[in-house]
């Protein structure tokens, strides 16, 4: 009886150490770098409309395009995009460009079942510096991607790109007339360099 318990204990010990080894290997394989696509040429090439539109509480809208990269480990972001701010009647207020400065946060929901393994869903907050015709300003760009049906992201999660101007308007409502998709494409160090 004691030998049997000793054998079972040894098996459990080995199984536990294997599980720890497997988890450590999975952690080393975790993707931490992504290309970010918001209404850009890549998205257009796979059949989604260019430009992502968000609305502020006063009815103003902002159209956004962005192509960039994020590195989760270093909280780094790079890339550039364009914006066009319209009032609630559709009249131009401002337009210009913006540059990613820093990744504030990123949650990776992983690839969707049935989709390409490099196409990840997630939520990023990226600090940007914008230069428009009316002046320059800082903003936070929120990029949400819920590509694919399963497993589902949290219920409050909405596909879209949102733009909060520091000391200004918060474009936090999806205003797209057609279904827009954003995308995080996983890349490896080898692909990046």
What function would you assign to each model-found segment?
Residues 1-9:
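Bacterial N-terminal signal peptides that target proteins for export
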Residues 8-17:
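Bacterial N-terminal signal peptides
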Residues 23-106, 169-193:
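N-terminal segment immediately downstream of the Sec signal-peptide cleavage site
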Residues 80-84, 124-126, 161:
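Short polybasic amphipathic segments
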Residues 112-158:
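Acidic, glycine-rich flexible loop segments
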Residues 158-173:
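Low-complexity, intrinsically disordered Gly/Pro/Thr-rich segments
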């Amino acid at each position: 009886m004691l030998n049997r318990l000793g054998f079972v204990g040894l098996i459990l010990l080995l199984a536990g150490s294997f599980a720890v080894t497997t988890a450590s290997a999975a952690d080393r394989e975790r993707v931490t770098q992504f290309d970010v696509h918001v209404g850009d040429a890549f998205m257009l090439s796979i059949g989604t409309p260019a430009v992502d539109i968000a609305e502020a509480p006063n009815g103003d809208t902002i159209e956004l395009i962005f192509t960039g990269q994020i590195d989760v480990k270093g909280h780094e972001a790079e890339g550039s995009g364009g914006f066009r701010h319209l009032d609630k009647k559709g009249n131009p207020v401002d337009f210009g460009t913006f540059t990613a400065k820093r990744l504030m946060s990123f949650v990776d929901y992983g690839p969707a079942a049935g989709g390409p393994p490099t196409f990840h869903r997630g939520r990023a907050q990226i600090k940007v510096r914008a230069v428009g015709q009316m002046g320059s300003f800082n903003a936070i760009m929120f990029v949400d991607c819920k590509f694919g049906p399963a497993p589902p992201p949290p219920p409050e999660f909405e596909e879209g790109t949102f733009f909060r101007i520091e000391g200004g308007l918060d474009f936090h409502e999806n205003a797209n007339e057609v279904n827009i998709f954003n995308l995080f494409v996983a890349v490896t160090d080898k692909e990046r360099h």
